[in-house]
Design a protein with these regions (language model features):
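Outer-membrane beta-barrel pore domains and translocons
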Residues: 1, 62-66, 77-79, 123-129, ...
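Outer membrane beta-barrel transmembrane domains
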Residues: 83-197
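Secondary-structure boundary elements
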Residues: 39-55, 68, 82-86, 161-166
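Outer-membrane beta-barrel translocator/pore domains, especially the C-terminal barrels
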Residues: 8-12, 41, 47-49, 131-132
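Extracellular/periplasm-exposed beta-strand and loop segments of Gram-negative cell-envelope proteins
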Residues: 4-31, 64, 89, 133-137, ...
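Extended, solvent-exposed, turn-rich assembly/linker loops in the middle of proteins
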Residues: 19-48, 53-60
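Transmembrane beta-strand segments that form the barrel wall of outer-membrane beta-barrel proteins
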Residues: 23, 55-65, 144, 170-176
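Residues that define the transmembrane beta-barrel architecture of outer-membrane proteins
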Residues: 30-38, 55, 68-78, 114-116, ...
Length: 197
């Protein structure tokens, strides 16, 4: 397939002396990926202007339609710390995931000498899955597939630091099983950096 994943992985395995992966005959065939995603977020916040310490809660509902992914989702994020950014939370790796654009001029990325902030966050997202190309297989060609779970949830814990216009965040994401017969649930880390100017 056009992504050249096999060639890239074989190159690294040859370079490092690792055994080559043997599942490439079962990968998805070339197919354009199209996904339209809509998400609505609502924020409630409480911040002490003297200490800059505060907390907020951000709820969300959403919908994705496409051959790569079709699902409904809902969830929330809670943040607590100093100089919370005036944005809509920290997203892990996903389509349309970056939402850290400041929403006002008092965001710590803009405020004079106090251009720093530090906060912890916890979030969850639950999805009702209609289609997942990585589990259901290609849309128009016969390919391998597995029986997917209809409901999948993510929970995340993380920390974010803001200095000047930069924001560095780390999250550890815990995901429930995505298909029947899956040995265990997944956990992965997400490190992101953004800069506002």
């Amino acid at each position: 397939p056009g992504a050249y994943g096999q060639e890239a992985q074989d190159f690294i395995h040859d370079l490092r002396g690792f055994e080559k992966f043997k599942g490439w005959d079962n990968q998805l065939r070339n197919e354009p990926g199209i996904v339209a995603t809509w998400e609505h977020k609502q924020k409630w916040k409480r911040i002490n202007p003297e200490t800059r310490f505060g907390y907020d809660a951000i709820t969300h509902t959403g919908l994705s339609l496409g051959n790569v992914s079709t699902h409904l989702n809902a969830g929330a994020e809670v943040r607590i710390g100093w100089a919370l950014p005036d944005d809509f939370g920290t997203s892990a790796i996903r389509p349309g995931g970056q939402n850290s654009t400041p929403d006002s001029t008092w965001d710590p990325r803009f405020v004079g000498e106090k251009k720093w902030g530090l906060h912890a966050f916890a979030s969850f997202d639950i999805r009702l899955v209609g289609r997942d190309i990585f589990l259901d297989g290609n849309s128009f060609k016969n390919s391998h597939s597995v029986t997917k779970e209809s409901i999948v949830a993510d929970a995340a814990l993380g920390i974010a630091y803001i200095l000047g216009g930069g924001r560095l965040s780390y999250a550890q994401i815990f995901r429930t099983k995505e298909f029947s017969g899956q040995g265990s649930s997944h956990s992965y880390g997400s490190l992101s950096f953004s800069y506002t100017f």
